[in-house]
Amino acid sequence: MSTRRAERAFEKGLQSIARGDFLAALGFFEASMALLPANGGTHAVAAMSYYGLCLACATDRLPEARDLCEAAVEAVPEDPDLYLNLGRVCERQEDREHAFRTYVRGLRLNPRHPGLVEALRRLGFRRRSVVGFLPRDHAVNRVLGSLRAALQRRPRRRTRRPKAA
């Protein structure tokens, strides 16, 4: 019975996050964690991660929020949503480098995770310049960078191999 109530509280917390109401979500995730046993598996760990995210977004308790999210990632390292939550907390702490690395680790698990892809796009990291010893705004780097981007946007052609007789 309490497991079902914990799941309902968890779902309401996710809905509150979707609305941007992190303070309400904080209460739902706290209730979910209280109703689940300490060894409640991945559901309890996810509740802890989302609680950390809400703590970072609704209050100024950023170190505690980051500790919770990092503990969740350590407990269940195969869940990309936990990496997204940790990355968002790192962004709130203005630690863009750690947020970037966290998003990339999450994308290794699921390369098409929409939240992680959007977070990386929003973060806006640049690629390395093509010719490293020249300044980024050097004409050679600008031309080669444009060429590299155009080649990567272009769909690849599949070459036909002759059928063996």
Task: Pin down the residues of each PLM region.
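A generic tandem-repeat structural signature
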Residues: L68-G106
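Short coil/turn linking the two alpha-helices of tandem helical-hairpin repeats
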Residues: G40, A56-D60, E94, R121, ...
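Alpha-solenoid helical repeat scaffolds
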Residues: F10, H43-Y50, D81-N85, R101, ...
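Alpha-helical adaptor scaffolds
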Residues: A18, L23, E30-D81
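Residue-level recognition of tetratricopeptide repeat
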Residues: L14, L53-C54, R88, R122
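Hydrophobic side-chain positions on well-ordered alpha-helices
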Residues: A9, S16, L55-A56, C90
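Intrinsically disordered, low-complexity, charge-biased linker/tail regions
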Residues: M1-T3, R8, Q15-G20, P63-E64, ...
